[in-house]
Structures are given as C-alpha cells and as structure tokens.
Swiss-Prot record:
GO terms for molecular function: mRNA binding; rRNA binding; structural constituent of ribosome. Part of the 30S ribosomal subunit. Forms a tight complex with proteins S10 and S14. Belongs to the universal ribosomal protein uS3 family. The keyword Ribonucleoprotein applies. This is Small ribosomal subunit protein uS3. One of its GO terms (cellular component) is cytosolic small ribosomal subunit. The keyword Cell division does not apply. Keywords: Ribonucleoprotein, Ribosomal protein, RNA-binding, rRNA-binding. Binds the lower part of the 30S subunit head. Binds mRNA in the 70S ribosome, positioning it for translation. Pfam families: KH_2 (PF07650), Ribosomal_S3_C (PF00189).
Length: 217
C-alpha cells in the first residue's frame, strides 16, 4: 500500500503528521469553493513559477474572508518591488472570489534541500537547461543529506538524454520507510519541458519519525 499511494495523502489526518492544503467548512457550496481553491493555486504556481513554491495553504475562517499562506524558496519574487506583485495577486484573487477580505502571507523555506516540491522543481529546471539527469539527481541527493535528510529517492521518466525510447531512471540513498505512518516523508512531482518531450520528476524525502513538536498542519 505504502509503495503505491501518494506518500503525502497516505499520512493526511488529524492524528497523523500531514495536514490538508485547504481548510474550510461548507455544506452546500463545497464544490464551488474547491474549484476556486484549484484556480487560486493554478494562478499562483503559474504566475510565480520562478519563486519555486513549495506549498499553498488556503484557509477560509468565514464566508467573508480568505487567508492564503505561500511557502516559497524565493519569496521576493512573489512580493515584488515595494509589494507591487503581491498587490496584483491580491486584486486578482478578490476578483476571482468576490471577497473583500483577502490576506496573503509569504513564508520563506530555509531548508529547501529537504523540501520535496522545491527539489523536484530544481531538478526539472536543470533538465530544461540540458544538464545531465544523472548529475542533477546526484546533486539533489547530496544537498538533501547536508540539510538533515535521512533518506531520499529521486525518479526521472521520459526520453532521458534524448533517447529514442522513453525509460525511467531512479536513485535512492538512505532509509525510505513508505509503509510507516509515523515516518515524516515529503513527496512531490514536477515536469521538465525539453526539446525531446516532457520528463517527469518524482521526489521522496524522509526527514525522520513523527514527534509531537515536528507536526505541522
């Protein structure tokens, strides 16, 4: 089971280590709000792809307000000069949701080498710049262990190196207990758009076992 399902979704729950990316309560309008959340994430991820966004957490404490927390490696790109970019984003979300109370919080990810989303995006960017996939994967593994990672697994799929036949290459270092629910495993994917086609990147990072002070929502 742990080998097949998404490592993040497998651990989502009030008593487990992972939390939901959307926090809201709606009886009749759940579908509408859910689609809105998807559009907001799409707007942020596509508009600020150079910022290397790790996570977008959307909270709706009431029917009149929305709080968006963005974790990114380069928060200055999202903020912009004198806050110009974040003001544009706020106005776009106000128009999309028809809410006047829109709050956006930007958080910098300091240990980005053990953040699966940022690591996957970094590998994808290197592949787009024609860096060897083996070099990109090995560099990511070494950097992860330097920042406290206890295990990492990286997979690249597609026409690697411009080969005629698509294949999958992967590397694994350290521990990766996918079946252990208390294991803090971060998982993410990314896509590299190359001249040979799309290359898919998957990253699993094991940060240690769950403890109460490590839990986040």
């Amino acid at each position: 089971m742990g080998q097949k399902v998404c490592a993040h979704g497998f651990r989502v729950g009030p008593t487990l280590i992972k939390g939901w990316d959307s926090i809201l309560y709606a009886e009749k309008h759940y579908k509408t709000l859910f689609i809105q959340d998807l559009k907001i994430r799409d707007l942020i991820n596509k508009g600020f792809n150079q910022a290397q966004i790790s996570r977008v957490l959307i909270e709706r404490p009431s029917n009149k307000s929305i709080i968006i927390n963005i974790n990114a490696k380069k928060p200055n790109i999202i903020i912009g000069r004198n806050g110009s970019e974040i003001d544009k984003l706020k106005k776009a979300i106000e128009k999309m949701t028809s809410l006047k109370e829109v709050y956006i919080n930007i958080h910098e990810v300091r240990k980005f080498n053990i953040d699966a989303a940022i690591v996957a995006q970094t590998i994808a960017l290197q592949l787009e710049k024609r860096v060897s996939f083996r070099k990109a994967m090995k560099t990511a593994i070494q950097a992860s262990f330097k920042q406290g990672g206890q295990g990492i697994r990286v997979s690249c799929s597609g026409r690697l190196g411009g080969a005629e036949i698509a294949r999958t290459e992967w590397y694994i270092e350290g521990r990766m207990p996918l079946h252990t629910l208390r294991a803090d495993i971060d998982y993410s994917t990314a896509e590299a758009i190359t001249t040979y086609g799309v290359i898919g990147v998957k990253v699993w990072i094991y940060k240690g076992e769950y403890t109460e002070n490590k839990r986040y929502n």
